[in-house]
Amino acid sequence: MSNAELETAIEAAWEARDSISPATKGAERDAIEATLAALDGGGLRVAERQADGNWHVNQWAKKAVLLGFRIKDMEMQSGGAQGGGWWDKVDSKFAGWGEADWKDAGFRAVPNCVVRKSAYIAPGVVLMPSFVNLGAYVDEGTMVDTWATVGSCAQIGKNVHLSGGVGIGGVLEPMQAGPTIIEDNCFIGARSEVVEGCIVREGSVLGMGVFIGKSTKIVDRETGEFTYGEVPAGSVVVAGSMPSKNGVNLYCAVIVKKVDAQTRSKTSINELLRD
């Protein structure tokens, strides 16, 4: 089925979702499984960057991910320590893989990384012991470092570095919400969090411990202007605070400078983050 045909079938299944169960057979189940397989293989993604820089969200693909929970029963998931396992509805992306599958996939998966079925991992990616949730997309050359998490349907660009302990939030519901997006060539510092469908635009650097959600003030130090929900391209961002009522300071993210690709290529991350 084409993506257009899958979209039509998924929208129809979504309208009848209360009747979808593990017993569901036929066209509805086939459409759900085909959509999840397309996400898993990278032929479909939950969000796509348009020529104008805006991101188009395929809400129907998110619906397919949610419907996927309805067509499976809970079952044992093998691979735990000392012969133990887990109890879940979603298989590992790597279930049933042999050496040929790994070679074809072209990415590196260090022991104890977890990737759930329907997440796409592009060639050249390195997965340290980390977690990538269902429906996510991790593009070429990206490093997902130790204990980093990529949430459901999150979109991670090319040549991104997600440092140790970074959290990229997942967004499945509410249905109208967009996924969290990290564009190409970004560096996200250790223990930082980007959540709630926020976007970090291309070539940006977040220092260690920067937290950005929809309600986080993002302040440009040079202009004093502040925005929400999006870090502009080429921004260097650190954690900061702003005065509030009654002498109390509240957390914010501070854009301390802007850099272009040429500057990034010649300057270390530590140098960029120094004031």
Curated annotation (Swiss-Prot):
Gene3D superfamilies listed in its UniProt record:
Hexapeptide repeat proteins, Tetrahydrodipicolinate-N-succinyltransferase, N-terminal domain
| Any single biological process term in GO | diaminopimelate biosynthetic process
Cystine crosslinks = none
Query: Where does this protein act, in terms of pathway?
Result: Amino-acid biosynthesis; L-lysine biosynthesis via DAP pathway; LL-2,6-diaminopimelate from (S)-tetrahydrodipicolinate (succinylase route): step 1/3
An MF annotation (GO) of this entry: nucleotidyltransferase activity
Keywords from the named record: Acyltransferase, Amino-acid biosynthesis, Cytoplasm, Diaminopimelate biosynthesis, Lysine biosynthesis, Repeat, Transferase
Protein known as = 2,3,4,5-tetrahydropyridine-2,6-dicarboxylate N-succinyltransferase
Q: Please give the organism.
A: Roseobacter denitrificans (strain ATCC 33942 / OCh 114)
